[in-house]
């Protein structure tokens, strides 16, 4: 293997392992966030049974569905997240070579900053093309509030993918893809762009204390998550459309979804579950720091 191929493989492995560990740890927070986001678009959750907030959700889930249901959809998330994060990190470095080749970060700060934004956004959008059906399945499995057996909408990852494909074809598995690309570019641009720029401004980036790296990463993930959160809410709502027919269809398209959420639920509805997303972002920050630490040993 060439040095470039070895470097790419190391990036892929380091990013994937770091992501799998952190996502499993924050899976319960992830499910709470998803339920708060999509409950208005769920056929299983009637108006009188909707969750009032994070605490209500955390208390009711184990009572109604069992403690293990906090990890519902986690297998799909880990399977999805391994290639997603690994591809993000691997492509990020490749795109950095394209956008930042020959750029001096000390004398060309804004060009350096813009290059980091572009490489981060392009990496996120590229990887999304490959793993979107898994992200879709993870959302639908996490939104499934049935206790067991016949009450469940899907029996598992494979059952979810097969049922939606039979019902809506490949288009059903990519429902909400367009708004996802918009959101992912905004999120990844901040996630990678600001983080790399901040790290690059430190006197000795490779020997920065892990706590400083974590603080930078934590701030970046919180800002990036809140900035792109409305896009995430809309894409999750659109994902809930797949498999529906006739009058069960709530939104005719992405723009209609934006309009109806704003009109019927108010602007704050775009940010439902956002606080749990900030907590979940601690896992994202941990991924960035862990990735840098793993790379030191590869």
UniProtKB/Swiss-Prot annotation:
Residues in compartment: Mitochondrial intermembrane: 1-7, 100-109, 200-210, 292-298
Modified residues (N6,N6,N6-trimethyllysine): 52
Keywords, ordered alphabetically: Acetylation, Antiport, Chromosome partition, Membrane, Methylation, Mitochondrion, Mitochondrion inner membrane, Phosphoprotein, Repeat, Transmembrane, Transmembrane helix, Transport
Name this protein carries in UniProt: ADP/ATP translocase 2
Regions of this protein lying in the Mitochondrial matrix compartment: 38-74, 131-178, 232-273
Record remark: domains: The transmembrane helices are not perpendicular to the plane of the membrane, but cross the membrane at an angle. Odd-numbered transmembrane helices exhibit a sharp kink, due to the presence of a conserved proline residue.
Residues modified as N6,N6-dimethyllysine: 52
Native source organism of the sequence: Bos taurus (Bovine)
Gene name for this UniProt entry: SLC25A5
Residues noted as binding ADP in the record, renumbered to the chain: 80, 92, 235
Subcellular localization: Mitochondrion inner membrane; Membrane
GO molecular function terms listed in the Swiss-Prot or TrEMBL record: ATP:ADP antiporter activity; oxidative phosphorylation uncoupler activity
UniProt record similarity statement: Belongs to the mitochondrial carrier (TC 2.A.29) family.
Positions of post-translational N6-succinyllysine modification: 43, 105, 147, 268
Residues bearing PTM N6-acetyllysine: 105, 147, 163, 166, 268
Topology of the protein relative to the lipid bilayer: Multi-pass membrane protein
Region described as Important for transport activity: 235-240
Motif placement: Nucleotide carrier signature motif: 235-240
